[in-house]
Structure formats: C-alpha cells, structure tokens
Amino acid sequence: AFGRVDVLINNAGLMPQAPLERRTLTDWDRTIDVNIKGVLYGIAAVLPQMQRQRGGQIVNVSSVAGHKVRAGGAVYSATKHAVRVISEGLRQEVKPWNIRTTVISPGAVESELPDSSTEADVREAMRAFYAENAIPADDFARAVVYAMSQPEDVDVNEILFRPTRQEY
C-alpha cells in the first residue's frame, strides 16, 4: 500500500564469537534470530510487492565468514552461510518476476559488529582486529551500488570482498 519497492538492502547481523564449549545458548538464539530470521522477514516484507510490480532487487548481506569458518565462529559462520543458501534459493524462485538477488559477503568493514559479542575477551579481540583491518563503510556501499547499477537483464549474484590486509 506504500507504492514501489525497488531495492531491499537486507543488512543486520550479530557476531558473538565464542568457542562452542562455552555453550552461549542465548547468544546462539539471538544470532540465529537476527542473522537468519531477520533476512527471511525482510524478504517476506518486500517480496509480494516486488512480485506485483514484476521487478526489484534484494541484496542480502552475508560475510566472508559464510565462506570460511574459524575456531570460535561456528555459529556466526553457519548463519552467514545460511544467508548465501537462502539467497541462491530465492534467486531461482523469483526469476519469473524479474527480481534480482545479490548476496554480498564482506570482510571486516567499519561498523558496530565487533561490539555484538557478550564475551568480554572476544569483544576486545574483535575490536582490536577491526581497528587494525577494517575498511570504511563506503567501500561496502560501492559494492552495493555496483550490483544495483547493472542493466536490468544482468543479475550480480554474489560479491565477496575484504580488506587487502585481512588474513582470512
């Protein structure tokens, strides 16, 4: 009832890194709720309108961690891999409506993400890593604009990028 929806930037995430043996069940639930269900709810909110208008673009934000898991990051990596899988399934489903789907998997980008860990030692380590490695949010924005600025018959399905100096 609000008119056209041309683009959804589906970008929300929590990154509570911790070894599985710590059994941070509350963090796991929150991470799954935000990183997976949040993406699904965003899609559900715009998909009917995009189908009616026979076009649009959904940009889901994953992470380098959705491609590679590190010790302490299994749950986060699993949720970000799920975003990639959801995005590919969505891409296959929405082709008849000319809806484009892109999944963007950034490495360390300046944001409040390192603050999302409830484990003090992990939070401080992530803050230090981001302080040394993170690239400006403008670099992320340029990746989004690249995907969005392609001709209507071109669908950039996946972009994986990270700071040059980032190890993984």
What are these regions (language model features)?
Residues 2, 18, 45-54:
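A short helix-coil junction within the Rossmann-fold of NAD(P)-dependent oxidoreductases
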Residues 21, 68-74:
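Active-site loop immediately N-terminal to the catalytic Tyr-X3-Lys motif
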